[in-house]
Design a protein with these regions (language model features):
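Charged, amphipathic alpha-helical linker segments immediately N-terminal to NTP-binding catalytic cores
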Residues: 1-6
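Pre-Walker A adenine-sensing motif
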Residues: 10-24, 31
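Conserved P-loop
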Residues: 25-103
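Loop/turn-to-beta-strand initiation segments
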Residues: 57, 105-108, 134-143
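Conserved ATPase-coupling elements of RecA-like P-loop NTPase cores
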Residues: 113-128, 146, 152-155
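Internal gly/pro-rich beta-alpha loop/helix module
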Residues: 143-165
């Protein structure tokens, strides 16, 4: 009797999809801290500068310096993409310009404040949704996140998963 050595079609499809997923998804690196002001953005910018020295194409999609001189210094030498201006209630705000990032298509884009709520009129309600769109275009994203933003989601996760500690 001859042994069938062909791959199972379903297994073959899973392998192909897994390989395609590797090729089409960017990678996410999160700089995580307990509270605002502990140096997440500073650390992210230092990491980005290191990558740039290694020849990696790194751009700034959105950074909030909060007026900190040390943080502003680390921006020097990095390409900063323009922000999108959005008017809301007769006041002009600036948000990250997703389209300029997608057109520029860097290897890595820096996106501060992952949990930020965008101004009404933006493409997405939350910045994390902006990040997902960027990742889906095979662009790697460095971002920052505070523990308090995760803590604020505990009740929602418990409710949606029918569990509670």
């Amino acid at each position: 009797m001859i042994k069938d050595t062909r791959l199972d079609p379903d297994e073959l499809l899973r392998k192909i999809q897994k390989e395609e997923q590797k090729e089409i998804s960017g990678r996410l690196k999160v700089f995580f801290g307990m509270v605002a002001g502990v140096g997440k953005t500073y650390a992210m910018l230092n990491a980005a500068r290191g990558l740039k020295k290694e020849g990696v194409d790194v751009v700034v999609g959105y950074i909030e310096t909060h007026g900190r001189k040390e943080t502003e210094e680390l921006l020097k030498g990095l390409e900063i993409l323009p922000r999108k201006k959005i008017e809301h209630r007769e006041i002009e705000f600036e948000e990250m310009d997703i389209d300029s990032i997608l057109r520029r298509k860097p290897e890595v884009v820096l996106v501060d404040e992952f949990a930020h709520t965008n101004i009404p009129g933006s493409r997405h309600v939350k910045r994390y949704q902006d990040v997902i769109e960027i990742l889906n275009h095979s662009i790697n994203v460095f971002t920052t996140l505070n523990v308090q933003h995760l803590e604020s989601q505990v009740e929602s996760v418990e409710k949606n998963n029918f569990c509670k500690n």
